[in-house]
Swiss-Prot record:
Main location: plastid
Protein species of origin: Huperzia lucidula (Shining clubmoss)
Pfam families reported for this sequence: PSI_PsaJ (PF01701)
An individual GO BP term: photosynthesis
Membrane-spanning ranges: 7-27
Membrane topology: Single-pass membrane protein
Listed name of the protein: Photosystem I reaction center subunit IX
Keyword check for Cell inner membrane: no
Family affiliation: Belongs to the PsaJ family.
Keyword Transmembrane: yes
Alphabetically ordered keywords of this record: Chloroplast, Membrane, Photosynthesis, Photosystem I, Plastid, Thylakoid, Transmembrane, Transmembrane helix
Upper classification of the organism: Eukaryota, Viridiplantae, Streptophyta, Embryophyta, Tracheophyta
Cellular localization per UniProt: Plastid, Chloroplast thylakoid membrane
PANTHER family: PHOTOSYSTEM I REACTION CENTER SUBUNIT IX, PTHR36082
């Protein structure tokens, strides 16, 4: 079990999980608020 915890705490694994979570969050926000990522004033 110690080896699994060590593996999951490495930088590439944490980065993959973080960016996957962030991408999913942005996709869901863009689904409910489709114009939020577009700046109409520009």
């Amino acid at each position: 079990m110690q080896d699994v915890e060590t593996y999951l705490s490495t930088a590439p694994v944490l980065a993959t999980l973080w960016f996957g979570f962030l991408a999913g969050l942005l996709i869901e926000i863009n689904r409910f608020f489709p114009d939020a990522l577009v700046f109409p004033s520009l």
